[in-house]
UniProtKB/Swiss-Prot annotation:
The keyword Aminoacyl-tRNA synthetase does not apply. NCBIfam families: nfo, PRK01060.1-2. It is an enzyme of class 3 (hydrolase). The lineage of its organism: Bacteria, Pseudomonadati, Chlamydiota, Chlamydiia, Chlamydiales. The gene is nfo. Endonuclease IV plays a role in DNA repair. It cleaves phosphodiester bonds at apurinic or apyrimidinic (AP) sites, generating a 3'-hydroxyl group and a 5'-terminal sugar phosphate. This is Probable endonuclease 4. Zn(2+) 2 binds at E153, D187, H224, E269.
Length: 289
């Protein structure tokens, strides 16, 4: 189930700050030369969300019109675990997922990105089935076909997290794509940490073919661009500035120029803040000239 087409121009951005209001994330994106952004719609480390007001919504939509940024992504909170074996955590997670989706629809956001979940003391198979049940409950929210896609982010495979391999993500998508719009956000640091070699054009082509065979490239809707502080397959989620980690700059140059990936929206999560992101956006844009 797809609700809107891919962008017609390459989109680059970063995870910007909502300090002072959600609309400020949009304006910060404009300041760093971004054409899209990722943001939190609520405090990512709290269960309780502040309700959206008409004023907040209008300010956000005004910022979108003034800046022409598009394909905005919301990153869901870190406490959410839709595969939790703990009934209390599971119920809180499902409430947060519902609220997150509702807020994204109200704001006109196109992507909402979730970490799939963690098995904790259960099996990964049971965790995956529980995640499917959690997101199946969201089907009524999509009855009017809002232009919003739920994205599952690739994980580094640390601890009991699921989603570190394409097979697990495929299982989620195959069981949900007839109920809600779903896709995948590849985090470059995470898949590298999980054991996918993406250090060269040749290795990237193998990974993308694997993705296409297992999931289908039409479900690849976004990238988180991060280098890695640790070598391949260490299952450690530690981001580094582009070209300053073990992945290397050629990997990101490939994503900007390869026909299958150049038009997919890309969001920086590199450590360093707005000044670094502005520099990295200019560098990435230069690869396409």
């Amino acid at each position: 189930m797809q609700v809107f087409p891919p962008p017609q121009v390459p989109l680059l951005g970063a995870h910007t700050s909502t300090a002072g209001g959600l609309h400020n994330a949009i304006y910060e994106g404009q300041e760093i030369g971004a054409s899209t952004i990722q943001m939190f719609t609520a405090n990512q480390r709290q269960w309780r969300r502040r309700p959206l007001t008409d004023s907040l919504i209008n300010s956000f939509k005004t910022a979108l019109k003034e800046t022409s940024l598009s394909y905005i992504m919301s990153h869901a909170g870190y406490l959410i675990n839709p595969g939790s074996p703990n009934p209390e955590i599971l119920e809180k997670s499902r409430i947060c997922i519902q609220q997150e989706i509702q807020d994204c629809i109200s704001l006109g956001i196109n992507f909402v990105n979730f970490h799939p979940g963690a098995a904790v003391n259960d099996t990964k198979e049971t965790c995956l089935d529980r995640i499917i049940s959690s997101f199946s409950l969201m089907e009524p929210l999509f009855e009017n076909s809002p232009p919003l896609v739920v994205l599952f982010e690739t994980t580094a495979g640390q601890g009991t997290l699921v989603g570190s391999n394409f097979e697990e993500l495929s299982y989620l998508i195959d069981n949900l794509n007839h109920k809600i719009p779903v896709g995948v956000c590849i985090d470059t640091c995470h898949i590298f940490a999980a054991g996918y070699d993406i250090t060269s054009p040749e290795s990237w082509k193998r990974v993308l073919k694997n993705f296409d065979d297992v999931i289908g490239l039409s479900y690849l809707r976004a990238f988180h661009l991060n280098d890695s502080m640790f070598p391949l397959g260490q299952h450690k989620d530690r981001h580094a500035p582009l070209g300053e980690g073990d992945i290397g700059i050629e990997s990101f140059k490939f994503l900007m120029t390869n026909e299958d990936t150049r038009m997919i929206p890309k969001y920086l999560e590199t450590p360093g803040g707005p000044d670094l992101w502005a520099k990295e956006i200019r560098q990435l844009q230069s690869f396409q000239k």
